[in-house]
């Protein structure tokens, strides 16, 4: 399941929910789309409860789910995560050239000048900038470098993403690692 957003407070008398969007693709939030709600740290599918989107107002970040129609029902979902299946996300979200689903980037090797620095284990958004969290290769850790480091998803650091080769080529990322 892919995190779409975090559910905030209840809004209005009809079960509206403030949605703090975590996705770059709000167009996926369409009437009739199946989503799931669960705690943000949910690991079990039993934790997920399925809903269907009634409507989403992007300008107000206001989400309405078909079976949630009172403020009391909406409050029960406050502080939970809104998720969508990877299959559903890929079906609904059309990517442009050079755009990627972050779930496809997890596990890719990070390579600079033919040296593998590590692999992407997570992607974090900090103050509107996305960062690749990279687990450093064992041989570099044994040389005293950090076990984990962050690479900003910016052209200065990211040279090329090659999904078919399962790697991300970088510039200046080794300097980040050495200074971590």
From Swiss-Prot:
It holds the Pfam family PRC. Keywords: Chaperone, Cytoplasm, Ribosome biogenesis, rRNA processing. It is found in: Cytoplasm. Residues 97-176 form the PRC barrel domain. SUPFAM superfamilies: PRC-barrel domain (SSF50346), Translation proteins (SSF50447). The keyword Cell inner membrane does not apply. The keyword Nucleotidyltransferase does not apply. It comes from the Bacteria. GO terms for cellular component: cytoplasm; ribosome. GO terms for biological process: ribosomal small subunit biogenesis; rRNA processing. GO terms for molecular function: ribosome binding. Belongs to the RimM family. An accessory protein needed during the final step in the assembly of 30S ribosomal subunit, possibly for assembly of the head region. Essential for efficient processing of 16S rRNA. May be needed both before and after RbfA during the maturation of 16S rRNA. It has affinity for free ribosomal 30S subunits but not for 70S ribosomes. The PRC barrel domain binds ribosomal protein uS19. PANTHER family: RIBOSOME MATURATION FACTOR RIMM. Binds ribosomal protein uS19. This is Ribosome maturation factor RimM.
């Amino acid at each position: 399941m892919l995190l779409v957003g975090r559910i905030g407070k209840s809004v209005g008398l009809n079960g509206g929910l403030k949605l703090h969007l975590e996705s770059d693709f709000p167009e996926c939030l369409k009437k009739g789309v199946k989503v799931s709600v669960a705690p943000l740290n949910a690991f079990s599918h039993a934790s997920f409860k399925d809903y269907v989107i009634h409507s989403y107002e992007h300008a107000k970040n206001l989400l309405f789910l078909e079976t949630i129609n009172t403020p009391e029902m909406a409050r029960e979902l406050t502080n939970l995560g809104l998720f969508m299946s990877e299959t559903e996300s890929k079906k609904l979200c059309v990517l442009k050239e050079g755009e990627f689903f972050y779930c496809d980037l997890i596990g890719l090797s990070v390579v600079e000048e033919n040296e593998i620095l590590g692999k992407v284990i997570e992607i974090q958004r900090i103050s509107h900038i996305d960062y690749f969290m990279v687990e450093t290769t064992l041989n570099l850790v044994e040389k005293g470098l950090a076990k984990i480091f962050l690479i900003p998803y910016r052209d200065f650091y990211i040279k090329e993403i090659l999904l078919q080769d399962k790697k991300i080529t970088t510039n200046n990322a080794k300097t980040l690692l050495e200074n971590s």
